[in-house]
UniProtKB/Swiss-Prot annotation:
The protein's name: Protein phosphatase 1H
Location in or out of the cell: Nucleus; Cytoplasm
GO cellular component, one term: cytoplasm
Catalytic activity reported: O-phospho-L-seryl-[protein] + H2O = L-seryl-[protein] + phosphate; O-phospho-L-threonyl-[protein] + H2O = L-threonyl-[protein] + phosphate
Lineage: Eukaryota, Metazoa, Chordata, Craniata, Vertebrata
Family annotation (Pfam families): PP2C
Record-annotated PPM-type phosphatase domain positions: 73-503
Its EC number(s): 3.1.3.16
Region (Disordered): 105-128, 188-225
Record-linked CDD domains: PP2Cc
Major location category of this protein: nucleus
Tagged with keyword Cell division: no
InterPro entries: PP2C, PPM-type-like_dom_sf, PPM-type_phosphatase-like_dom
Length: 510
């Protein structure tokens, strides 16, 4: 066992820091791919340009050719890795999706309005749809980043399909979302209640008196003896996003028997709907809002360290998932055989602190979570704990599947654009971990703020140039000792993808 796991550690940790080619998947390569590999459609690259962009030595930074081809004058830039993988395994998509109301039968997204092709996206001045169209449905804006590992297959599939899964969750709740004056009904078809209502209950005493609302009373809804939760409208959108992530992951699982869908991916998306931004994250990409010179975090990273207790608890409840080769307990270092019977510091799923325990034979097994920081791995294999795909991922040279420990559930945070006025310099920055591995939030704040301050506020290219500047700062300059950034620090050798989304455009749409 030790030799096998040691082999996994050596092959994985030695040279592939972010975990890409070192992951062991068993998906059949003789199957056709679901979607051909490409770069984001909105970049408008020719096949020759895509080939030239894959230069691991020069690492050219790609930006939008036409700024008006993304909503809200959104800026975007990307760069390939320094040789970690053949392709840039990041993927990005941006859509404006119109969803029809459900009427009798299941409705589906309007194919023409869902912007499947990049050229159909409206520019920043043409986002508002006709009133008669909005009566029949609802429109949402969508930005997404997918950071692939062990191949770009899952990232490509998710970039093509996730927004459709979101749209499929919306038809049933369109009228409810539009009517913010009343609470969402507990059951569809019930009469909605005003949000100013003090209670959604009927006391037993009132029922026995035959008052308004009692059984037989002509004026009232059905009797309820128990308090009902008041569900905010935004929770319906959060639930729709959570279900869309789940369905996307299940779809990848189903289709991998028909198509070759390599690896897995993290997913960071933003949905603008009815005046609010919904940021959903599953993985280690990051989103921050820069407003009035301040940072508002809009996501959390999900790694073996941040999700240690969840992973340990699952292993505690289902020890068979460990294949009799791993221990769910954490120790400050690997336990040695000579330490059996001694007292050593340890940490279990129920603990944030540490305690001492007597070392047993079982503690000699390899730890479920191995390494620290960016080197932390689940079963010495993968460094992210949430995302899409990875259904075939196994521990090296074993039959132990890692997918049971990985979750597709995103964390969703909400930002109400209507509650704030925004200047031309207030932005939402989305980026894959290639940026955040080398730049702190404060460095991104300083870079974006200073760059935009020196740009014409009316220049629509300013956000693309700001995204390009961030990528350049994270990639650095190639020197004798590799890619270097400010203060001669090591630059990012990972794929880097960045959106810079101006928030004042959201106020205009609202």
């Amino acid at each position: 066992m030790f030799t096998r796991v040691k082999s996994a550690v050596v092959s994985f940790m030695g040279g592939i820091m972010a975990g890409s080619s070192g992951l062991e998947h068993v998906n059949g390569s003789d199957l056709p791919v679901r979607f051909s590999y490409t770069r984001p459609e909105f970049l408008g690259l020719s096949p020759d340009e895509i080939e030239c962009s894959a230069d691991h030595i020069a690492r050219p930074i790609l930006i939008l050719k036409e700024t008006q081809r993304l909503p809200w004058s959104t800026g975007y830039a990307e760069v390939i890795n320094a040789g970690k993988s053949t392709h840039n395994e990041d993927q990005a998509s941006c859509e404006v999706v119109f969803v029809k109301k459900k009427s009798g039968v299941q409705s589906t997204p309007n194919k023409n309005s869902s912007s499947k092709r990049r050229s159909s996206l409206p520019n920043a001045e043409g986002l508002q749809l006709k009133d008669n169209q909005e009566v029949d449905g609802i429109t949402f804006h969508y930005w997404a980043l997918f950071d692939g590992h062990a191949g770009a297959g899952a990232a490509v599939v998710a970039s093509k399909l996730l927004h459709h899964h979101i749209a499929e969750q919306i038809p049933d709740i369109i009228d409810i979302l539009k009517n913010s004056a009343v609470l969402p009904p507990t059951c569809l078809g019930e009469e909605p209640e005003s949000t100013s209502s003090n209670s959604r209950t009927l006391t037993r005493a009132a029922s026995l008196r035959g008052g308004s609302g009692a059984p037989g009373s002509p004026s009232t809804p059905p009797t309820r003896f128990f308090t009902e939760k008041k569900i905010p409208h935004e929770c319906l959108v959060i639930g729709a996003l959570e279900n869309a992530f789940k369905e996307m992951d299940l779809r990848i699982e189903r289709e991998r028997s028909t198509y070759s869908i390599s690896g897995g991916c993290t997913a960071l998306i933003v949905v603008y709907l009815l005046g609010k931004l919904y940021v959903a994250n599953a993985g280690d990409s990051r989103a921050i809002i820069i407003r009035n010179g301040e940072i508002i975090p809009m996501s959390s990273e999900f790694t073996p360290e941040t999700e240690r207790q969840r992973l340990q608890y699952l292993a505690f409840l289902q020890p068979h998932l460990l294949g009799n080769e791993f221990t769910h307990l954490e120790f400050p270092r690997r336990v040695q055989r000579k330490e059996v019977g001694k007292m050593m510091l340890y940490r279990d799923f129920n603990m944030t602190g540490w305690a001492y325990k007597t070392i047993e034979e079982n503690d000699l097994k390899f730890p479920l979570i191995y390494g620290e920081g960016k080197k932390a791995r689940v079963m010495a294999t993968i460094g992210v704990t949430r995302g899409l795909g990875d259904h075939d991922l196994k521990v090296h040279d074993s039959n132990i599947y890692i997918k049971p420990f990985l979750s597709s559930v995103p964390e969703v945070r909400v930002y109400d654009l209507v509650q704030h006025e925004h200047s031309a310099d207030d932005v939402l920055v989305l980026a894959t971990d290639g940026l955040w591995d080398v730049l702190f939030n404060e460095e991104v704040l300083e870079a974006v703020t200073s760059f935009l301050a020196n740009c014409d506020p009316d220049d629509p290219h300013r956000y693309t140039l700001a995204a390009q500047d961030l990528v350049m700062r994270a990639r650095g300059v190639l020197k004798d000792r590799g890619w270097r950034i400010s203060n001669d620090r090591l630059g990012s050798g990972d794929d880097i993808s960045v959106y810079v989304i101006p928030l004042e455009h959201g106020n205009r749409v609202s």
